[in-house]
Structures are given as structure tokens and as C-alpha cells.
A protein has these predicted regions:
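Amphipathic alpha-helical dimerization/coiled-coil segments
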Residues: 1-3, 56
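Active-site acidic-Proline motif in GNAT/NAT acetyltransferases
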Residues: 112-114, 118, 146-147
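C-terminal "cap" of GNAT-fold acetyltransferases
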Residues: 3-10, 20, 138-152, 156-189
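Residue-level preference for beta-strand/loop junctions
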Residues: 59, 102-103, 136, 174-176
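Short phosphate-binding/catalytic loops that engage adenosine nucleotides
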Residues: 111, 120, 137, 160
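Acetyl-CoA-dependent GNAT
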Residues: 14-88, 93-114, 122-127, 131, ...
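Short coil/turn segments at alpha/beta junctions that flank glycine-rich nucleotide-binding fingerprints
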Residues: 35, 118, 134-138
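Residues that form or flank phosphate/diphosphate-binding pockets in enzymes
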Residues: 101, 119, 150
Length: 189
């Protein structure tokens, strides 16, 4: 965290603009190479997923949170609608079949290092959960790795539970991919 950076100085928008998705891929490539040693395989994975999202983006069912400070993107989170059949047999590299769903995938959550520890991650998680409720999603899931300790701490604090693990070398090094799921209580009528 850098002195002078405060949550109140950061704005979040929900509309995509040209260049946003490309920049998010760039941030993932740069930050994860530096912090985790991920290679071009990881960047290719991110690019493929963002391309899939761009082609299937539905503003009524999907949501992006693009956090900016002084007109620069400093954080990002994406909620992507998924079919139940895809969700049940998902791996990090599967594509959506396009059916109606009540499942939302949390993807590409990233904060620049100077913007961690100021409450921005918490704010984005609360907004993600609010969008789930507003849009009548009852389930969410995400994939991460065994190296993302701070992220996992945040996810589990908001109710995500580990449901699957597998060894992978998809990011140019061996690690454990982990799936976390969240189920919201349904309102009985």
C-alpha cells in the first residue's frame, strides 16, 4: 500500500470500454510473472478467457468492475454467467454452452500491488455478492491456485468453500488449481 492512496479516491465503473480487456490481460501477465513466475501459458489462458467473455458478454447477466485511480485502471473483477452443466464439470479451460443459468463465475480478480490492503478487495467482493442477489444468481464459483493465499482468504471470508483440486502445469510451472464454490440461500416463498 502506498501512502496517499485511499479507497475514497478510487472509482469503479461497470461498463466496458475499448482497450479494457486487453489491458486486463496485460496486467495479469505482468503481475503474475513478477509475483508467481507464471509464463506465457498463463497469459494465453487469460487472453482466451477474456476473448470468450467478449464474445458472450451480456450486460444483463454479466458484470465487470473496473476500478480506476487518476484515470488509470488499478483493479478489476468479472462476473460471467455460466450454464449449470458446464459448472458441474468445469475445469479452468472449459467454455460456456450458453444456456440460462443461476451460476456466476468470478474471474480475473486483480489489484495492482499499491492498491491492496485498503479495502478495495472487500468492496469488490461485496459488490459481486450484491450483483448475484440482484440478478437472482444462487451459486458462484471460481478457480485459483494454491499460491494465491491472500485471495483465498478473501474468498473464504465471504463464504466460498474449496470443492476441487488438481495438479496442473498450465501456467508454465507445476501448481495446484483449486475450485471454490459459493451457494447463497434461496428465499422460500
Amino acid at each position: 500500500m502506498t501512502p496517499g492512496i485511499h479507497l475514497g479516491n478510487i472509482t469503479c465503473r461497470n461498463e466496458l470500454r475499448p482497450g479494457d480487456l486487453g489491458y486486463i490481460a496485460y496486467l495479469h501477465g505482468q503481475i503474475y510473472a513478477k509475483e508467481c513466475g507464471y509464463g506465457l501459458g498463463f497469459e494465453a489462458y487469460v487472453l482466451e478467457g477474456l476473448q470468450e467473455f467478449a464474445h458472450q458478454y451480456d450486460p444483463d447477466r454479466d458484470r465487470v468492475w473496473i476500478c480506476e485511480h487518476d484515470n488509470n485502471i488499478v483493479g478489476f473483477l468479472l462476473g460471467f454467467h455460466r450454464s449449470d452443466s458446464m459448472h458441474r464439470s468445469d475445469s479452468m479451460h472449459r467454455s460456456d454452452s450458453g444456456h440460462q443459468t443461476d451460476t456466476l463465475q468470478l474471474r480475473y480478480f486483480i489489484l495492482l500491488p499499491d492498491y491492496r490492503g485498503i479495502g478495495l478487495g472487500k468492496k469488490l467482493m461485496l459488490e459481486f455478492l450484491a450483483f448475484m442477489k440482484l440478478s437472482n444468481y444462487t451459486r458462484a464459483y471460481l478457480w485459483t491456485t494454491n499460491e494465491q493465499h491472500a485471495a483465498v482468504s478473501l474468498y473464504t471470508r465471504y463464504g466460498f468453500r474449496l470443492t476441487e483440486e488438481k495438479i496442473s502445469d498450465a501456467f508454465d510451472k507445476q501448481l495446484t488449481e483449486r475450485k471454490y464454490e459459493l451457494e447463497l440461500p434461496t428465499n422460500s416463498k
